[in-house]
């Protein structure tokens, strides 16, 4: 059952109201999820689950949310470059993404080539749909998505981010919601505070203390959301706290817990992590911001169904139900 339909808290619902709605996809997150789990094979005998699965994911969320606009954002070529220039070990140690099933006719290199082909191909499909798509060189999708949610154009809109990445919790507010598909959960400000004990305005600070193993950013020893939410419970406030204030609190507390000492003695680690994690000020050039803003303002909604059907025929799979996309 859709989480939209079974949420008890009305503040967390994707409200069917006068608010316009923009659906924003963290594209690589969705594509890799589809690529890994969708077993679809083309009539040519090649894996096409990345393409087919991502399109199905898109259709499902369009059905559920009925958006006025759809934006798909990819990590750009060398997208991690800015953060790697600060920390060369950023994102190191990640295991390569592999199919969770074996194809006896594909070598490791052929599987990699197929994955890259499917990604470029699904981008072509979306270019023929009424979708705004971004892939900016040397910029990560997280920064572009964060910037889009800040655009005055979307003031008063409900902004739904589709991603399993918890980094986006920091930019959630009354209008911006994070839908985490693998958890089948929708997070708004209230839910985030309830789950983590931390308000979105203080989320980057809290995560700078906790660290992020997926990005190879170690945190303070013994710090997790449960501990941070309990020991630094003021981070649940909507007021934005600074690293200085947290350090000062830890230095002046009467508690003898090692947790506070560890924070007070590791300011540089926390400051470093904050610089790497924060999305409040997206790491984008002025030119990149102008490009995104103007691309959205000048977008003309088109649906090239004939081209899509031809592509599907070439790629060896049958027609899906496109009407749900055409209506938007």
Features from the language model and the residues they span:
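Short hydrophobic transmembrane-like helices used for membrane targeting/insertion
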Residues: 4, 15-18
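Short hydrophobic targeting helices and cationic amphipathic motifs
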Residues: 7-10
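Noncatalytic, basic helical substrate-engagement surface that gates or grips nucleic-acid strands
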Residues: 20-159, 168-186, 278, 283-298
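Detector for intrinsically disordered, low-structure N-terminal pre-sequences
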Residues: 14, 21, 242-246
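Acidic, His- and aromatic-enriched active-site or binding-groove loops in soluble protein domains
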Residues: 162
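Non-catalytic nucleic-acid-binding/docking modules located in mid-to-C-terminal regions
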Residues: 63-74, 89, 93-96, 102-103, ...
